[in-house]
């Protein structure tokens, strides 16, 4: 199977490439930079350039495109001078890929987010829920990307994830390990609830999907139950052997961020098992393996 992966400089794209290579598939990575130090099979691609997208994907002629590239700086996306750029990447870039996939009759896997919903209540979001109410620019543009995929293609997977961490990039765990080293106590919000997603585990699932034709919308995070960022931090410090005290605070007490954050990031993952996909391991287990991987 020949697979093109976008955004391979990021946490998820990096792990998807490694998983594809491990399974003996022909994996071609792409990103906006000229070259990539990790992968030989690499092509520079600016997904906002429609002609370039069409040319590159048509020439490669993959069986599947795994589209991980995105603008993910949630707060920065709120700046007036950034909104069009964010939309160009998350919405238009995704549409460029979807239209080319349609032309060459190729599967597409699009990575999305719980931010397409309003983040309220306590009920886990169903993958087929169409009650979209994004809280911020990032969520709105990712939703536009989802619609570009679902309106143009039949052979697609839209996979929503949350609270992502991986080896190749910045994430909440790395931030907390640094902060916990410097200060005797840290304040972390306890009223935003969800489940972490380890990109190494998610990559395995995405390649399983690429090998199948069980198309549709899915939610995929690690198992292990729904937690707050406070709970997550307590477990991070426990596993890392930190004595740092963690103080729970509300989002309101913590202070405003530019972009509104969802209180309810609970994602219902039942559809994975219903369609024969193997769920991800628990987040506690994922955290333990991750800390070993980054040699903590």
Task: Label each region the model flagged.
Residues 34-49:
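Rossmann-fold cofactor-recognition segment
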Residues 1-23:
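N-terminal Rossmann NAD(P)H-binding glycine-rich loop of SDR-like oxidoreductase domains
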Residues 84-96, 116-159, 164:
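Catalytic helix-loop patch of NAD(P)-dependent Rossmann-fold dehydrogenases
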Residues 147-194, 200-201, 208:
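NAD(P)-dependent short-chain dehydrogenase/reductase
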Residues 47-89:
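NAD(P)H-binding glycine-rich loop region in Rossmannoid oxidoreductase-like domains
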Residues 228-234, 250-290, 294-296:
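Conserved C-terminal active-site "lid" loop/helix of NAD(P)H-dependent oxidoreductases
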């Amino acid at each position: 199977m020949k697979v093109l992966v976008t955004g391979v400089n990021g946490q998820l794209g990096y792990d998807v490439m490694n998983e594809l290579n491990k399974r003996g598939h022909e994996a071609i990575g792409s990103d906006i930079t000229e070259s990539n130090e990790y992968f030989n099979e690499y092509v520079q691609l600016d997904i906002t350039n429609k002609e370039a997208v069409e040319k590159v994907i048509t020439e490669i002629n993959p069986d599947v495109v795994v589209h991980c590239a995105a603008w993910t700086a949630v707060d920065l996306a709120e700046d007036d001078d950034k909104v069009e750029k964010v939309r160009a990447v998350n919405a238009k870039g995704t549409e460029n890929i979807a239209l080319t996939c349609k032309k060459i009759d190729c599967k597409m896997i699009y990575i999305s987010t719980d931010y397409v919903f309003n983040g309220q209540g306590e009920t886990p979001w169903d993958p087929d829920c169409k009650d979209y109410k994004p809280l911020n620019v990032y969520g709105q543009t990712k939703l536009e990307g989802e619609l570009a995929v679902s309106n143009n293609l039949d052979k697609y997977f839209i996979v929503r994830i949350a609270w992502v961490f991986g080896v190749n990039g910045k994430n909440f765990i790395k931030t907390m390990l640094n902060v916990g080293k410097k200060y005797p106590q840290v304040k972390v919000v306890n009223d935003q609830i969800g489940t972490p997603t380890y990109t190494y585990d998610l990559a395995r699932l995405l390649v399983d999907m690429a090998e199948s034709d069980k198309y549709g919308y899915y939610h995929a995070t690690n198992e292990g139950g729904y937690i707050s960022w406070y709970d997550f931090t307590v477990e991070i410090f426990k596993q890392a052997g930190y004595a740092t005290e963690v103080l729970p605070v509300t989002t309101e007490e913590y202070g405003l961020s530019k972009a509104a954050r969802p209180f309810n990031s609970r994602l219902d993952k039942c559809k994975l098992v219903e369609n024969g996909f193997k769920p991800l391991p628990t987040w506690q287990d994922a955290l333990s393996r991750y800390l070993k991987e980054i040699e903590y």
